[in-house]
Amino acid sequence: MIKLKVKKGDEVVVITGKHKGKKGKILKVFPEDSKVIVSGVNLVKKHTKPNQMSEGGIITKELPIHISNIAHIDPKTGNPTKVAFKFLEDGSKVRVAKKSGEIIGKEGK
């Protein structure tokens, strides 16, 4: 298991694969598999049988994609960027966009 630099709610863009260029927010992170679910990316249709709890039909849902296929969106420029960690004066650790130096995530809002 590797250290992930992504969190739920981060804005990312797909950089490789059939969904290249699509942007979305991270809905769920699977650290043990190094995968994430991104809203609106890697959509599949699943046929479900009816049961006592719900009726059957076709549902559309997102499947996980590997974290190597995504990149953070720079909050300043809107372009893909790498992420670094930085310590602030108060001692807190934050994620920073390498291209612009802007803080990524809730810490920067």
Swiss-Prot record:
It comes from the Bacteria. InterPro entries: KOW, Rib_uL2_dom2, Ribosomal_uL24, Ribosomal_uL24_CS, Ribosomal_uL24_KOW, Translation_prot_SH3-like_sf. CDD domains: KOW_RPL26. One of its GO terms (cellular component) is ribosome. Keywords: Ribonucleoprotein, Ribosomal protein, RNA-binding, rRNA-binding. Gene3D superfamilies: 2.30.30.30. One of its GO terms (biological process) is translation. One of its GO terms (molecular function) is structural constituent of ribosome. HAMAP family: Ribosomal_uL24_B. Part of the 50S ribosomal subunit. NCBIfam families: rplX_bact (TIGR01079). One of two assembly initiator proteins, it binds directly to the 5'-end of the 23S rRNA, where it nucleates assembly of the 50S subunit. One of the proteins that surrounds the polypeptide exit tunnel on the outside of the subunit. Belongs to the universal ribosomal protein uL24 family. This is Large ribosomal subunit protein uL24. It comes from Rickettsia felis (strain ATCC VR-1525 / URRWXCal2) (Rickettsia azadi).
